[in-house]
């Protein structure tokens, strides 16, 4: 019996100027495995806050190279409730399809975490997503700063 790797993902999306012509959105995920972290991000261009949140979870899951047991933490109730089947999918269907494909190979537990209350890993993902949205491209320095901020937080002790 093969045991799946236990991975923790904190993800956050950001849409600066949401609903405006100059809208810039980004998605970031911080992945933890045995106390080690890495960050992945994607510049989305014009996308809403909701779309950026969906993309952030997809970006994290897409970066996994093999099927894993994954705890995904997000401050988006929209993502958690939809992926847990409690909200119906009426809009953003291509975004949900991407997330479904990304989640497919994995055993995923979706968990909501309150945003902007000082949780170190969530705050690092939030700051990185805002930074990439503002920059208009994925800046490796922003991602490295997020990982440096998190350090070696024990992802196995997060609940």
Segments and roles (model prediction):
Residues 46-50, 54, 89-92:
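Flexible, glycine- and charge-enriched loops at secondary-structure boundaries
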Residues 136-159:
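Acidic two-metal-ion nuclease catalytic site recognized across multiple nuclease folds
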Residues 2, 118, 148-151:
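N-terminal non-cleavable signal-anchor helices
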Residues 1-51, 62-68, 158-159:
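RNase H-like nuclease fold core
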Residues 31, 35-39, 47, 74, ...:
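Amphipathic, alpha-helical segments enriched in basic
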Residues 8-23, 57-126, 133, 137, ...:
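RNase H catalytic domain
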């Amino acid at each position: 019996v093969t045991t799946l790797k236990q991975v923790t993902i904190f993800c956050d999306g950001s849409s600066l100027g949401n609903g405006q012509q100059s809208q810039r959105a980004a998605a970031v995920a911080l992945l933890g495995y045995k106390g080690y972290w890495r960050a992945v991000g994607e510049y989305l261009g014009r996308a809403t806050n909701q779309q950026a949140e969906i993309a952030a979870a997809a970006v994290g899951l897409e970066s996994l190279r093999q099927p894993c047991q994954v705890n995904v933490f997000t401050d988006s109730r929209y993502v958690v409730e939809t992926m847990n089947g409690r909200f119906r999918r009426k809009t953003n269907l291509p975004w949900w399809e991407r997330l479904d494909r990304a989640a497919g190979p994995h055993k995923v537990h979706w968990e909501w975490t309150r945003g902007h209350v000082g949780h170190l890993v969530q705050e690092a993902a939030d700051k990185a997503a805002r930074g990439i949205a503002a920059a208009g491209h994925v800046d490796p320095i922003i991602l490295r700063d997020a990982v440096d901020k998190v350090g070696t937080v024990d992802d196995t002790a997060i609940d």
